[in-house]
Amino acid sequence: MFERNQKTIFVLDHTRYFSISSEQYISMDYLKGKPVQETPASGSSSMVVGTQLSKSLWTCAVESSIEYCRIVWDLFPGKKHVRFIVSDTAAHIVNTWSPSTQNMSHVSNAMMMVSVPSRSIPQSSDYSVIHGLRAAIEALAEPTDEQLLATQVGCKQIPNKGRVICITSARDNTSMKSLEDIFNTVLLQQNALVAPPSKKGLQIDHCHLVILNIVPLGVESLVTNRNLLEISPLLDVEIHTVNAPDISDKLLHLIMGHYDLASTTVTNIPMKEEQNANSSANYDVEILHERAAHTRVCGPDFTLTTSIKPGTTYETVTLKWCTPRGCGSSDLQPCVGQYNVTPVDVTSRPSSCLINFLLNGRSVLLEVPRKTGTKTTSHMLSARGGEIFVHSLSIARSAMDEAPSISDGPGGRVSDYRIPELGQLFKMSRMVPLKTKPKGKCSQGEHLWRRLPRYFPRTTNVTILFNLQRQLNWLPHFLHLIVKEDMDKQDEVRCQQQIHELYKSASRGDMLPFNTTNNARPKVGKTKDQYRLFYRELEQLIQLNAQTPHHKNLLESLQSLRAAYGDVSSKLDPGASHLRSYTESPLSPERLEPTSSASNSSSSILKASKRRMSSSGQRSLLDMISIAERSQSNKRLDFSGRLCTPLGQTAKLYPDFGNKEKDILTPGVVTSNLKDESIRS
């Protein structure tokens, strides 16, 4: 309810330095009066030069800060509060948290009375921005009307956060560090004053201090920029050094992050030309509003295109003006939200024309720039009660629409989802809270959650293993044992027997019992491919659940069976590519094509060792090189230090390195030094 942006306080430095020029000159041409003539160096002719004016640093600071609060009060009328404090020899309060002073006219009239600092002010330590920062902390402790109402209702804990924007000019980073330390100290002192039992205000939960270091145009500053930094649990500080003419753009960029705003540029607005009323031209107007106006209209499956305008650092969404036309409510999409809007440049002619057009009771539809032939209307601008709103129209699937069927996939209708099996997986993965906290870093539920869904084909056309559960009576119990985490020796023997029976069926040429519409027996090559895919999917399932040594023994047996069945060669089978397209799972390993026929003896397969699998006929080049290097290294003597070191200790390399006495007594070292001297001579 009470966010950090509910309270914002501007502290304006009113010292002598802010009376100097910003060094950005504006040429003024007068309609009346004699123009100033300037004779060039050649002296042959003269040219008319208009008067050049320049704003002071104080004027730039006041204009930009008032523009900041105008945007806040336009978008959040009566909800967000902004205060101003002017600091010179003391802190001057411009307005309070009262709604009667939270308006543009009150702040503008007060700033006119303050005026620009005088250059005749003597340089003194009494003129400081610290007075204003102290007053800002005291103002944060004062409750707003909403906080007072919450106190009367009976709220015991009222959040109190705020932001302080200090516009000043510091000499270097040391001065900035001193300013931060003083602000943090005063913040702690203020919280100590309002602590019980005094209760002279609200305790400040957190403060965000933004320091804008202002310098004239073309002047180098010794203060470096710094991103948001946590000084203490109560204070975050960020520092920005900007030229005085650019302070408005900087505050516009900051306000979008402070209040979570977004920018929209309305393009192709037809307007009459001032010089020629019979013709019209297209203009663009940039408006600000809450970011939710874009996020709510899009939904999760649609995004609006953004761009960065020249001279800015933030993104803006471009929407095209749609010619107003009469249409009924049935022609419009449902509205999902409305938000206040305000123009970025309120004094420009295009902005003024758009505001007057809307305040006269007209509505404007905004459409997304077309990428296809269809027209998508995403927003609508209208005014009610003197305020302008942007309405977000739903262009994604509405909550009132019927949800699409689960079988309607992106590639068309999918009718073979394994929905019952997925329900069983949910039941197996269901967790309930425990009364006592489990011991250890990883609970049993988290371990189960990580292990169960590692391999689950979503559709029936990508798996052979799970399609045969109804046809093979032993397969469901076999799969249950594979997934079983605490497999014992008896379970391993049962699985070994089933693998043995499966290989015997493959050796006899028995076809797998698929449900087929006709009783035609598949060809021999096709039957082998089915068994080969069955083996591969079964191997992947065992490999993902290999938690015990019994699982690993099963995996080695199955790998031996696959190797003997001929599933290790790169010879291409004519029908294998076609089978792969509809029988292979997406999570299956890389395909291994068959070669020559295997032996029919199942007992020899199960007893085959790894040495037989890696025989000379199947060894790779890397295996042969590794064996040669290993045999060559065995012929060399081991490191003498390792041979002399007792077992369990570490041998030290160069034990006498760095020992000066040892170096002097070593004749080899002396000889080498003499040789070096002779070479140099």
From Swiss-Prot:
User: Tell me, which GO biological process terms does this entry list?
Assistant: cell division; centrosome localization; dorsal appendage formation; flagellated sperm motility; meiotic cell cycle; oocyte nucleus localization involved in oocyte dorsal/ventral axis specification; posterior mRNA localization involved in anterior/posterior axis specification; regulation of fertilization
GO CC annotation, single: nucleus
The PTM entry states: Phosphorylated.
According to its UniProt record, where is this protein located?
A: Nucleus; Cytoplasm; Cytoplasm, Perinuclear region
- According to the record, the signal peptide region is none
Q: Which InterPro entries match?
A: Cell_cycle_regulator_Mat89Bb (IPR019355)
Q: Where is this region: Disordered?
A: 574-619
Q: Does the keyword Signal apply?
A: no
Q: Which Pfam families match?
A: Mat89Bb
Motif Nuclear localization signal (NLS): positions: 606-612
The alphabetical list of record keywords is: Cell cycle, Cell division, Coiled coil, Cytoplasm, Developmental protein, Differentiation, Meiosis, Mitosis, Nucleus, Phosphoprotein, Spermatogenesis
Q: Which family does it belong to?
A: Belongs to the Integrator subunit 13 family.
Biological role stated in the UniProt entry? Component of the integrator complex, a multiprotein complex that terminates RNA polymerase II (Pol II) transcription in the promoter-proximal region of genes. The integrator complex provides a quality checkpoint during transcription elongation by driving premature transcription termination of transcripts that are unfavorably configured for transcriptional elongation: the complex terminates transcription by (1) catalyzing dephosphorylation of the C-terminal domain (CTD) of Pol II subunit Polr2A/Rbp1 and Spt5, and (2) degrading the exiting nascent RNA transcript via endonuclease activity.
How is this protein organized at the quaternary level? Belongs to the multiprotein complex Integrator, at least composed of IntS1, IntS2, IntS3, IntS4, omd/IntS5, IntS6, defl/IntS7, IntS8, IntS9, IntS10, IntS11, IntS12, asun/IntS13, IntS14 and IntS15. The core complex associates with protein phosphatase 2A subunits mts/PP2A and Pp2A-29B, to form the Integrator-PP2A (INTAC) complex.
Name used for this protein in its record: Protein asunder
Task: Write down the species.
Answer: Drosophila virilis (Fruit fly)
Q: Which gene encodes it?
A: asun
